[in-house]
Amino acid sequence: MNVCVIGLGSMGKRRIRLLKQFFHELKIIGIDNNLERMKSVSTEYKVDCYLALSEFGEKADCAFVCTSPQFHASIIKECLERNLHVFSEINLIDKLYDENIRLAEQKGKTLFLSSTPLYKDEIQLIRSKVKQNGRPCAYQYHVGQYLPDWHPWDKLDKFFISNKSTNGCRELLAIELPWIQSVFGRIKAVKTTKTNLTDLKIDFYDTFLIQIEHETGAVGNLAVDVVSRQAVRRLEIFNEELYIRWNGTPNSLYEKDIISKQLKQIPAGTYIHESGYSEAINEYAYLKEIENFFEAIEGKEALYSFEEDKEILKIID
């Protein structure tokens, strides 16, 4: 199978790294219109790279779209028109969603959307325990990191997280809300307080405090920011018979034993960490969603869809 990775920034490199490490039968091609980046990735990962998909003479079978989100829509459309199965990183805007969904159906191709937390063992365990408990619960969740620390090697004004339509808080919400809805039930209502706490030259709010009501009766407080100088993911879930705590990593998931009154660690699967990233970034979850993409090509249902994401983006808007 010929696999094109389009966009050779941090996410494109991650996908290439995992594809080379765990899927040895694939031929991997890199695509990036930045000549310097294209050459660098070709040298570092020993893959053929091109400036445009049209330069790749052989027929590709699928594409990973890993560019900045504002460019996804047109690239996805081109890939589908070329009869490629498509894996897309999160989009943040729903441009061409309906058109690309219809095009994928017409072409008989898989249109797959990343939602990495859904593939984390911790999230799947949390979901299982909340469902098993069977009662409405409350939760508090804080996720944030100071915006310039996301990619310190990039100039902030050149990075899509500083763009109003694809900003850092919007990305965090697009990452977190799908699993929150999966665990606690369909979102019924939200109330939001938003403000700016930094002196960063940005044209969007840097802090959101959100109260969420779910159709199941669950309620939550969600704090999302690009202010916190400590990268943080901190979750507490509770009701009369349940208490769960998680700090974003596989070894930080705890549940209170109601009988013994002791907090007990819950083993939460495999942890693969890449140097230079927050400890909350588990490469294993990225690997699992790549596997799900290839399974979806063979007919298995994906964990997340463009249709579901369209609804999440409406909530964010």
Where are the regions a protein language model picked out?
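Predominantly a Rossmann-like dinucleotide-binding segment in NAD(P)-dependent oxidoreductases
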Residues: 117-193, 198-201
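C-terminal helix-rich "cap/oligomerization" subdomain common to oxidoreductases
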Residues: 62-65, 109, 215, 280, ...
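Conserved acidic residues
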Residues: 28, 61, 137
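N-terminal Rossmann-like dinucleotide-binding module
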Residues: 1-44
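Glycine-rich, N-terminal phosphate-binding loop of Rossmann-like dinucleotide-binding domains
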Residues: 66-67, 143
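Beta-strand-loop-alpha-helix segment that lines the small-molecule cofactor/substrate pocket
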Residues: 62, 69, 73-118
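Contiguous beta-strand/loop segments that form the cofactor/metal-binding neighborhood of enzyme cores
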Residues: 172-252, 287-300
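Short acidic low-complexity segments
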Residues: 46-59
